[in-house]
Amino acid sequence: MSHSVKIYDTCIGCTQCVRACPTDVLEMIPWDGCKAKQIASAPRTEDCVGCKRCESACPTDFLSVRVYLWHETTRSMGLGY
């Protein structure tokens, strides 16, 4: 399974995504761009299971997780065997 995780600029530093993640792929890092002075880090996508709990927990739609199963990806690219 491969994952593409998009991070947008609307993080408010609430830590909801970090607390929701069952595999701890996110962490908060210092950032001066919001009141909380922290932002969710880029996730370790190799450990992401694609459950989208972080996305569901986010109150500002900061995270977008797209999960592609290998056979679906190859089929959509015309590479299915």
Curated annotation (Swiss-Prot):
GO terms for biological process: photosynthesis; photosynthetic electron transport in photosystem I. [4Fe-4S] cluster 1 binds at residues 11, 14, 17, 58. Its cofactor is [4Fe-4S] cluster. Binds 2 [4Fe-4S] clusters. Cluster 2 is most probably the spectroscopically characterized electron acceptor FA and cluster 1 is most probably FB. Gene3D superfamilies: 3.30.70.20. GO terms for molecular function: 4 iron, 4 sulfur cluster binding; electron transfer activity; metal ion binding; oxidoreductase activity. It comes from the Eukaryota. [4Fe-4S] cluster 2 binds at residues 21, 48, 51, 54. Residues 2-31, 39-68 form the 4Fe-4S ferredoxin-type domain. One of its GO terms (cellular component) is photosystem I. Its main location: plastid. It is found in: Plastid, Chloroplast thylakoid membrane. Disulfide bonds: none annotated. It is an enzyme of class 1 (oxidoreductase). Its EC number is 1.97.1.12. Keywords: 4Fe-4S, Chloroplast, Electron transport, Iron, Iron-sulfur, Membrane, Metal-binding, Oxidoreductase, Photosynthesis, Photosystem I, Plastid, Repeat, Thylakoid, Transport. It catalyses: reduced [plastocyanin] + hnu + oxidized [2Fe-2S]-[ferredoxin] = oxidized [plastocyanin] + reduced [2Fe-2S]-[ferredoxin]. The eukaryotic PSI reaction center is composed of at least 11 subunits. Apoprotein for the two 4Fe-4S centers FA and FB of photosystem I (PSI); essential for photochemical activity. FB is the terminal electron acceptor of PSI, donating electrons to ferredoxin. The C-terminus interacts with PsaA/B/D and helps assemble the protein into the PSI complex. Required for binding of PsaD and PsaE to PSI. PSI is a plastocyanin-ferredoxin oxidoreductase, converting photonic excitation into a charge separation, which transfers an electron from the donor P700 chlorophyll pair to the spectroscopically characterized acceptors A0, A1, FX, FA and FB in turn. This is Photosystem I iron-sulfur center. It comes from Spinacia oleracea. The lineage of its organism: Eukaryota, Viridiplantae, Streptophyta, Embryophyta, Tracheophyta.
